[in-house]
Amino acid sequence: MKPEWLTNLHETVTAEGGAVRVTIIRADGSAPRGVGSAMTVGRAVFTGTIGGGALELTALLAARDLLDGYVAVTEPQWRREVRDFPLGPALGQCCGGFVQLLFETVGEAELRDVPVASSKDMLLARPIKSGQPWRFATHRKDDQEAWPLGVRSHVRKCLSGTRGRDAVLNSDWFIEPVNAPVQALFVYGAGHVGRAVVKTFADF
């Protein structure tokens, strides 16, 4: 499988020399999008969304500020920042909740650790502090001894099917499915209208 966001990340870094991946790692109360929503920001383009509005614009500008100060390196650095965003009057956002965003700078050196394609059930795990690369797991025994116990347990349960594969913050690590979870859609009625509806939604 070739997730769109991985393709976009590779294309942006290749074309522009660097990108920032912005991910919602915590969302309390009313928020425009949930945990795991993300966007890839380049100097000229961005893809994905964290919900639009003032939050997304502020995050977009912050990501481009990081890119302005980015200098290409030969060895991967995996620079990360976590920023808090109360969604109130100060931000000009009326949701009233609270969001925590993870900013990760990815250059050509970091991109060497990132696959282009993935298996259906692949998970991505990494600490929210700088330094360590993205870790990908496709089997319940792909966890590593250096990972916190809670992270290892979560990855194993997700990949064995005993726990849902929702994005989660665990022991200061963020774990998310590489491929967006497939949502079931039940259509009652098998006539021409029902078939047309199924055909329309098949690509979503």
Model-identified regions with their sequence ranges:
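Segments forming oxygen-rich coordination pockets for charged ligands
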Residues: 1-204
